[in-house]
Amino acid sequence: MTEKLKGTTTVGIVCKDGVVLAADRRASLGNMVLSERVTKVFQIDDHLAIAGAGTVGDILSLVRLLRAEAKLYRAKVSREMSVKALATLTSNILHSGRGFAYMAWFLVGGYDSAPRLYSIDAAGGVTEDRFTAAGSGMEFAFSVLEENYRDGIPLEEGVKLALRAIKAATKRDVFTGGGVTLVTITEEGYREWSEEELKSLLE
């Protein structure tokens, strides 16, 4: 088989006190669903995270590289990399690999002096956003985000909005499904929400 595991919807939202990153858990090969338990949101450091939409192998490869670079940076300067620095590093890696491109789109979120969110395309183009989505179901997620997002949204409302956006994509996009991974990054650090916590918010 020449096709690769791919397909997903990722969402990022800047809230008053932090950033929300969320993604579905389905991995597909062509028209086949191969897994409903794939993780697509990853912690890079205490206040840094990344979500990937696209080819699973490429996402995991980049995550390993970014984690190593973040550890090296911390060892050299005795502090954590800024969110913008992580986004720039990700962009540089993607841009330098244009001849053998990563088949993925990334959302970088984190908290340094404030919550920040960046989207980075496969060629390395970077955009700072208040909210964004990527992947095969992004247009359905965007419709929910654009209608309901507001500046200064409280973190719990941002979590609920991210879940609604992923749910909208799940209903309409065959490559999105299998549950949700959702994390928040605040001044206190990185936190992955449990399935029970997310379910209670939707009740």
From Swiss-Prot:
The way its activity is modulated is described as: The formation of the proteasomal ATPase PAN-20S proteasome complex, via the docking of the C-termini of PAN into the intersubunit pockets in the alpha-rings, triggers opening of the gate for substrate entry. Interconversion between the open-gate and close-gate conformations leads to a dynamic regulation of the 20S proteasome proteolysis activity.
Q: Name one GO molecular function term.
A: threonine-type endopeptidase activity
Give the HAMAP family listed for this entry. Answer: Proteasome_B_A
InterPro entries linked to this entry: Ntn_hydrolases_N, Pept_T1A_Psome_bsu_arc, Pept_T1A_subB, Proteasome_bsu_CS, Proteasome_sua/b, Proteasome_suB-type
Please give the organism. Answer: Thermococcus kodakarensis (strain ATCC BAA-918 / JCM 12380 / KOD1) (Pyrococcus kodakaraensis (strain KOD1))
Which residue positions are annotated as catalytic?
T8
Specify whether Hydrolase is a keyword of the entry.
Answer: yes
Q: Where in the cell is it found?
A: Cytoplasm
Family of the protein in this entry: Belongs to the peptidase T1B family.
An example Gene Ontology biological process: proteasome-mediated ubiquitin-dependent protein catabolic process
- Give the multimer and partner information: The 20S proteasome core is composed of 14 alpha and 14 beta subunits that assemble into four stacked heptameric rings, resulting in a barrel-shaped structure. The two inner rings, each composed of seven catalytic beta subunits, are sandwiched by two outer rings, each composed of seven alpha subunits. The catalytic chamber with the active sites is on the inside of the barrel. Has a gated structure, the ends of the cylinder being occluded by the N-termini of the alpha-subunits. Is capped at one or both ends by the proteasome regulatory ATPase, PAN.
Q: Where are the transmembrane segments?
A: none
Checking Pfam families in the record gives: Proteasome (PF00227)
| Functional description taken from the UniProt entry | Component of the proteasome core, a large protease complex with broad specificity involved in protein degradation.
Q: What is this protein called?
A: Proteasome subunit beta 1
Gene Ontology annotations for the cellular component aspect, listed alphabetically: cytosol; proteasome core complex, beta-subunit complex
Keyword Secreted (UniProt): no
Class of the enzyme per the UniProt entry, highest EC level: hydrolase
Per its record, the protein catalyses: Cleavage of peptide bonds with very broad specificity
Proregion positions: 1-7
Q: Which UniProt keywords apply?
A: Autocatalytic cleavage, Cytoplasm, Hydrolase, Protease, Proteasome, Threonine protease, Zymogen
What EC identifiers does the entry list?
3.4.25.1
